[in-house]
Swiss-Prot record:
It catalyses: a ribonucleoside 5'-triphosphate + H2O = a ribonucleoside 5'-phosphate + diphosphate + H(+); a 2'-deoxyribonucleoside 5'-triphosphate + H2O = a 2'-deoxyribonucleoside 5'-phosphate + diphosphate + H(+). This is Nucleoside triphosphate pyrophosphatase. Its cofactor is a divalent metal cation. The active site is at 70 (proton acceptor). It comes from Cyanothece sp. (strain PCC 7425 / ATCC 29141). GO terms for cellular component: cytoplasm. One of its GO terms (molecular function) is nucleoside triphosphate diphosphatase activity. The lineage of its organism: Bacteria, Bacillati, Cyanobacteriota, Cyanophyceae, Gomontiellales.
Length: 195
Protein backbone atom coordinates (compact mmCIF):
# COMPACT_ATOMS: atom_id res chain seq x y z
CA UNK A 1 0.00 0.00 0.00
CA UNK A 2 1.23 3.48 -0.89
CA UNK A 3 1.45 6.14 1.80
CA UNK A 4 -1.01 8.93 0.97
CA UNK A 5 -0.65 12.39 2.49
CA UNK A 6 -3.24 15.17 2.32
CA UNK A 7 -1.58 18.60 2.46
CA UNK A 8 -4.68 20.24 3.91
CA UNK A 9 -6.51 20.54 7.20
CA UNK A 10 -9.85 20.51 5.35
CA UNK A 11 -12.21 18.02 6.99
CA UNK A 12 -14.27 17.88 3.77
CA UNK A 13 -11.25 16.82 1.69
CA UNK A 14 -10.24 14.22 4.28
CA UNK A 15 -13.80 12.84 4.34
CA UNK A 16 -13.93 12.64 0.54
CA UNK A 17 -10.72 10.59 0.52
CA UNK A 18 -11.99 8.36 3.33
CA UNK A 19 -15.24 7.79 1.42
CA UNK A 20 -13.23 6.10 -1.36
CA UNK A 21 -11.10 4.04 1.01
CA UNK A 22 -8.04 6.30 1.28
CA UNK A 23 -7.14 7.13 4.90
CA UNK A 24 -4.57 9.89 4.44
CA UNK A 25 -2.03 11.22 6.82
CA UNK A 26 -3.03 14.87 7.22
CA UNK A 27 -0.51 17.70 7.31
CA UNK A 28 -1.47 21.35 7.22
CA UNK A 29 0.92 23.18 4.92
CA UNK A 30 0.65 26.61 6.60
CA UNK A 31 1.67 28.10 3.25
CA UNK A 32 1.13 31.88 3.13
CA UNK A 33 -1.37 32.21 0.28
CA UNK A 34 -1.03 36.00 0.31
CA UNK A 35 2.55 35.58 -0.96
CA UNK A 36 1.17 34.54 -4.38
CA UNK A 37 -0.21 37.31 -6.58
CA UNK A 38 -1.44 35.89 -9.87
CA UNK A 39 -4.28 37.54 -11.79
CA UNK A 40 -5.33 34.48 -13.81
CA UNK A 41 -7.80 32.48 -11.69
CA UNK A 42 -6.87 29.12 -13.22
CA UNK A 43 -3.16 29.64 -12.74
CA UNK A 44 -3.69 30.95 -9.20
CA UNK A 45 -5.45 27.87 -7.79
CA UNK A 46 -3.01 25.52 -9.51
CA UNK A 47 -0.03 27.44 -8.14
CA UNK A 48 -1.46 27.53 -4.61
CA UNK A 49 -2.21 23.79 -4.71
CA UNK A 50 1.35 23.10 -5.87
CA UNK A 51 2.89 25.32 -3.20
CA UNK A 52 0.85 23.69 -0.43
CA UNK A 53 1.81 20.19 -1.60
CA UNK A 54 5.49 21.13 -1.95
CA UNK A 55 5.68 22.56 1.58
CA UNK A 56 4.39 19.28 3.01
CA UNK A 57 6.40 17.04 0.66
CA UNK A 58 9.60 18.80 1.71
CA UNK A 59 8.89 17.90 5.36
CA UNK A 60 8.47 14.16 4.78
CA UNK A 61 11.26 11.71 5.55
CA UNK A 62 9.71 8.75 3.70
CA UNK A 63 8.26 8.40 0.19
CA UNK A 64 4.55 9.14 -0.22
CA UNK A 65 1.93 10.53 -2.54
CA UNK A 66 1.17 14.10 -1.46
CA UNK A 67 -2.06 15.80 -2.54
CA UNK A 68 -2.47 19.56 -2.28
CA UNK A 69 -5.62 21.42 -3.33
CA UNK A 70 -6.87 24.97 -3.45
CA UNK A 71 -10.41 26.09 -4.25
CA UNK A 72 -12.00 29.43 -5.09
CA UNK A 73 -15.36 30.53 -6.37
CA UNK A 74 -15.33 32.85 -9.37
CA UNK A 75 -18.47 34.94 -9.70
CA UNK A 76 -18.82 37.76 -12.23
CA UNK A 77 -15.04 37.69 -12.77
CA UNK A 78 -14.20 38.09 -9.08
CA UNK A 79 -12.45 35.49 -6.90
CA UNK A 80 -14.02 34.47 -3.61
CA UNK A 81 -12.12 32.35 -1.11
CA UNK A 82 -13.22 31.93 2.50
CA UNK A 83 -15.08 34.94 3.90
CA UNK A 84 -13.24 37.10 6.44
CA UNK A 85 -16.12 37.32 8.90
CA UNK A 86 -19.93 36.95 9.14
CA UNK A 87 -20.56 40.38 7.59
CA UNK A 88 -18.41 39.40 4.59
CA UNK A 89 -20.31 36.10 4.25
CA UNK A 90 -23.66 37.92 4.31
CA UNK A 91 -22.52 40.41 1.66
CA UNK A 92 -21.26 37.57 -0.52
CA UNK A 93 -24.49 35.65 -0.32
CA UNK A 94 -26.43 38.79 -1.20
CA UNK A 95 -24.36 39.06 -4.38
CA UNK A 96 -24.30 35.29 -5.11
CA UNK A 97 -28.00 34.52 -4.78
CA UNK A 98 -29.68 33.85 -8.10
CA UNK A 99 -26.29 33.85 -9.87
CA UNK A 100 -24.07 31.22 -11.47
CA UNK A 101 -20.41 30.89 -10.58
CA UNK A 102 -17.51 28.57 -11.23
CA UNK A 103 -15.84 26.60 -8.46
CA UNK A 104 -12.19 26.15 -9.42
CA UNK A 105 -9.99 23.63 -7.64
CA UNK A 106 -6.30 23.28 -8.34
CA UNK A 107 -4.98 19.78 -7.63
CA UNK A 108 -1.31 18.84 -7.22
CA UNK A 109 -0.21 15.26 -6.71
CA UNK A 110 3.45 14.85 -5.84
CA UNK A 111 4.77 11.30 -6.21
CA UNK A 112 7.83 11.01 -3.98
CA UNK A 113 8.25 7.36 -5.01
CA UNK A 114 8.99 8.34 -8.63
CA UNK A 115 9.89 12.03 -8.16
CA UNK A 116 7.03 13.19 -10.38
CA UNK A 117 4.51 16.00 -9.96
CA UNK A 118 1.15 16.47 -11.66
CA UNK A 119 -0.81 19.73 -11.51
CA UNK A 120 -4.39 19.82 -12.77
CA UNK A 121 -7.50 22.02 -12.66
CA UNK A 122 -11.17 21.10 -12.28
CA UNK A 123 -13.96 23.60 -12.95
CA UNK A 124 -17.57 23.09 -11.88
CA UNK A 125 -20.49 25.44 -12.51
CA UNK A 126 -22.63 26.23 -9.47
CA UNK A 127 -26.08 27.81 -9.85
CA UNK A 128 -27.19 29.48 -6.62
CA UNK A 129 -30.82 29.77 -5.56
CA UNK A 130 -32.46 33.11 -4.91
CA UNK A 131 -32.73 33.20 -1.11
CA UNK A 132 -34.03 35.87 1.25
CA UNK A 133 -31.93 38.04 3.54
CA UNK A 134 -33.47 36.11 6.44
CA UNK A 135 -32.28 32.78 5.01
CA UNK A 136 -28.83 34.25 4.41
CA UNK A 137 -28.57 35.54 7.98
CA UNK A 138 -29.73 32.20 9.40
CA UNK A 139 -27.23 30.28 7.27
CA UNK A 140 -24.32 32.55 8.16
CA UNK A 141 -25.28 32.29 11.86
CA UNK A 142 -24.55 28.53 11.69
CA UNK A 143 -20.89 29.36 11.06
CA UNK A 144 -20.68 26.90 8.17
CA UNK A 145 -20.02 29.44 5.40
CA UNK A 146 -17.06 30.92 7.27
CA UNK A 147 -14.96 27.79 6.65
CA UNK A 148 -15.61 27.33 2.94
CA UNK A 149 -14.36 28.78 -0.33
CA UNK A 150 -17.28 30.72 -1.76
CA UNK A 151 -19.03 30.85 1.64
CA UNK A 152 -21.04 27.64 1.15
CA UNK A 153 -20.69 23.92 1.77
CA UNK A 154 -22.46 21.76 -0.81
CA UNK A 155 -22.27 18.78 1.55
CA UNK A 156 -23.83 20.75 4.41
CA UNK A 157 -26.63 23.26 4.90
CA UNK A 158 -25.33 25.23 1.92
CA UNK A 159 -26.53 22.43 -0.36
CA UNK A 160 -30.06 23.71 0.26
CA UNK A 161 -29.21 26.91 -1.57
CA UNK A 162 -27.64 25.42 -4.70
CA UNK A 163 -30.11 24.84 -7.54
CA UNK A 164 -27.78 23.04 -9.91
CA UNK A 165 -24.26 21.73 -10.38
CA UNK A 166 -22.80 21.32 -13.86
CA UNK A 167 -19.69 19.18 -13.66
CA UNK A 168 -18.05 17.32 -10.80
CA UNK A 169 -19.95 17.52 -7.47
CA UNK A 170 -16.98 16.37 -5.36
CA UNK A 171 -14.94 19.23 -6.82
CA UNK A 172 -17.37 21.66 -5.18
CA UNK A 173 -16.77 19.92 -1.84
CA UNK A 174 -13.00 20.29 -2.12
CA UNK A 175 -11.41 17.83 -4.53
CA UNK A 176 -12.46 16.09 -7.71
CA UNK A 177 -12.47 12.33 -7.11
CA UNK A 178 -12.62 11.52 -10.84
CA UNK A 179 -9.65 13.83 -11.45
CA UNK A 180 -7.72 12.19 -8.60
CA UNK A 181 -8.32 8.77 -10.22
CA UNK A 182 -7.01 10.11 -13.54
CA UNK A 183 -3.94 11.60 -11.85
CA UNK A 184 -3.17 8.32 -10.05
CA UNK A 185 -3.59 6.44 -13.33
CA UNK A 186 -1.27 8.87 -15.13
CA UNK A 187 1.39 8.04 -12.53
CA UNK A 188 0.88 4.30 -13.07
CA UNK A 189 -1.21 3.64 -9.96
CA UNK A 190 -4.71 2.49 -9.18
CA UNK A 191 -6.76 4.05 -6.39
CA UNK A 192 -6.69 0.57 -4.81
CA UNK A 193 -2.92 1.00 -4.33
CA UNK A 194 -3.80 3.61 -1.67
CA UNK A 195 -6.39 1.53 0.23
Amino acid sequence: MLQFVLASASPARRQLLQSIGINPLVYQSNFDESSVAIADHHELVQTLARCKAEVVANQLAAPALVLGCDSVLVLQGKIYGKPKDPADAIARWQSMRGQSGELLTGHTLIDLYQNKTLVRLEITQVDFAWISDRQIAAYVATGEPLNCAGAFALDGRGGLFVDRIVGCPSNVIGLSLPLLRKMLTALGYSPADCW
